[in-house]
Amino acid sequence: MTQKHGKNYVAAVAKVEAEKAYALNDAVSLVKEIDFAKFDASVEVVFKLNVDTRQADQQLRGAVVLPNGTGKDKTVVVFAQGDKAKEAEAAGADVVGAADLVQRIQGGWLDFDVAVATPDMMAQVGRVGRALGPKGLMPNPKTGTVTMDVTKAVSDAKGGQVTYRTDRDGNVAVPVGRVSFEEGKLAENIKSIAETVLKARPAAVKGTYVQHVSISSTFGPAVTLDINTL
């Protein structure tokens, strides 16, 4: 069944040249222009990569702190004990705990955006892996959320860090801010994640690595980016 789009979406699509790859600054300007949401919509960049995600060494996963943040205040929880718990509290973590935090999550509480854990807590955190995993909340060394440096982890999470990973089709989708952001700040954020994705190119990849890049707002149509302008 063909999905029907509303008149606002159709009008937005009409302003996008389907076969054109826009320079970064032009693409950002257009995405802001054609957004029709009645709220401050998120802006997302999507990279289509030439990777075989069936191979473990071609699965990308990591984190990057965007220079201008994401426009979202994140709630951060930290699994830690003793001095590391005090350190996390001092760093500004919203909730810090150990077995008590595990029990709270077992009870159904998942009202947070980022979970950080010290390595010694991972055995306990594993007890709630089935709750955290599907939500993308499971602490992981690759994203800097399993660490003894809880101060940095909390600071990064609060300061605009985003995580990225390839889906099964080789796509990497990352939020880079909001429509209300100045064009230059959105462009800087997009360049930052682009540099990170390019540096993460798996050694086994042959030929063209980045096949396509686009940006869009929450409900708006995608605008294709000229990769050479990133």
From Swiss-Prot:
Transmembrane segments: none annotated. It holds the Pfam family Ribosomal_L1. Keywords: Repressor, Ribonucleoprotein, Ribosomal protein, RNA-binding, rRNA-binding, Translation regulation, tRNA-binding. One of its GO terms (cellular component) is large ribosomal subunit. One of its GO terms (biological process) is regulation of translation. One of its GO terms (molecular function) is rRNA binding. Binds directly to 23S rRNA. The L1 stalk is quite mobile in the ribosome, and is involved in E site tRNA release. Protein L1 is also a translational repressor protein, it controls the translation of the L11 operon by binding to its mRNA. Belongs to the universal ribosomal protein uL1 family. NCBIfam families: rplA_bact. Part of the 50S ribosomal subunit. This is Large ribosomal subunit protein uL1. The gene is rplA.
